[in-house]
């Protein structure tokens, strides 16, 4: 209860600044990339409940989600993948041409995650906690996923602080 109070209080305090950035980024994306400006994806949250995660769209509209899924599953199975042929390959897909120039900047600055504040206000997420996984990711974590899902997922957490997507599956 105290954590939820903290999350909502922080979001409300920073809401004027958040709204300014949301509006500016939204208009810029609308002009540069067109609609849709938001990327909505089902994620696994607390108690393994599914919820819709909101982010700014950073990829071309034609980007296939199965591309990431197959890459991720190959990593999880220990298959050797490009570019270093190491099973400890970070999750990030290097030189991913599906990512727009604007999207690359938003990702680097973590501004693509700004719409996650709506998930905090809806009670699906917290400010700090483990990142919510996509369903096919959560299935691979087994018992560890039960621990992850015992708390609300967060906008930021230990993995983001320690190395973001440059961490391998084993290091996450």
Model region roles, listed by residue range:
Residues 1-14, 18, 22-172:
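Conserved small/aromatic sequence motifs within transmembrane helices
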